[in-house]
């Protein structure tokens, strides 16, 4: 089982990795081992256009995650439409509400969008962050108690 620290580190790494996923080609490149490639709606191209990144696990080879809202979907069927599945399960995703290409946004528009992406991350992973902080505080408290109990031990000689 992963500790809160491991989950926290993985979460932050995902946030950093996904900052490059505004680019369609970068998202598409993650689908090299995607199980659905032709004669279906959920092709790598359609998945990437809908904002998804391929995030397979050992047990689930078809896990896809939106780089923006971090919604993970698995159990894809050939007739599943990535846009429809995404919008049904993440109605407030900022990527889905874009009306123009990210490259056409003003700097202010892009920064606002990126701020929304980071807010999505913190909403999703706030419990992981809190668990990590609690574990660290517990460990620090234990170390302090051990330190002070060792430094201030009294020995009483009962023979004298």
Curated annotation (Swiss-Prot):
Positions of Zn(2+) binding: 66, 69, 86, 93
One Pfam match: BIR
Residues bearing the modification Phosphothreonine: 43
Localisation: Cytoplasm; Nucleus; Chromosome, Centromere; Cytoplasm, Cytoskeleton, Spindle
Major localisation: cytoplasm
UniProt modification remark: Ubiquitination is required for centrosome-targeting.
One of the record's GO cellular component terms: kinetochore
Molecular function as annotated in GO: metal ion binding; small GTPase binding
Keyword Cell division tagged: yes
Disulfide bonds: none
Domain of life, source organism: Eukaryota
Notes on the domains: C-terminus is required for spindle assembly.
Classification via PANTHER family: BACULOVIRAL IAP REPEAT-CONTAINING PROTEIN 5.1, DETERIN
Role, per record: Component of the chromosomal passenger complex (CPC), a complex that acts as a key regulator of mitosis. The CPC complex has essential functions at the centromere in ensuring correct chromosome alignment and segregation and is required for chromatin-induced microtubule stabilization and spindle assembly. Stimulates the mitotic kinase activity of aurkb/aurora-B in the CPC. Does not appear to exhibit anti-apoptotic activity. CPC. Does not appear to exhibit anti-apoptotic activity.
Protein name: Baculoviral IAP repeat-containing protein 5.1-B
């Amino acid at each position: 089982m992963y500790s809160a620290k491991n989950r926290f580190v993985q979460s932050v790494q995902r946030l950093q990795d996904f900052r490059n996923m505004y680019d369609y080609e970068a998202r598409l490149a993650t689908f090299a081992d995607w199980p659905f490639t032709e004669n279906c709606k959920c092709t790598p191209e359609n998945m990437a256009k809908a904002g998804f990144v391929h995030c397979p696990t050992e047990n689930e080879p078809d896990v896809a995650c939106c780089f923006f809202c971090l919604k993970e979907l698995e159990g894809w069927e050939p007739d599943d439409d990535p846009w429809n599945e995404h919008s049904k399960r993440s109605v407030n995703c900022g990527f889905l509400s874009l009306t123009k290409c990210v490259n056409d946004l003003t700097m202010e528009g892009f920064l606002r969008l990126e701020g929304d992406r980071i807010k999505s991350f913190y909403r999703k992973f706030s419990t992981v962050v809190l668990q990590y902080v609690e574990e660290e505080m517990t460990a620090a408290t234990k170390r302090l108690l051990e330190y002070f109990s060792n430094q201030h031990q009294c020995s009483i000689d009962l023979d004298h």
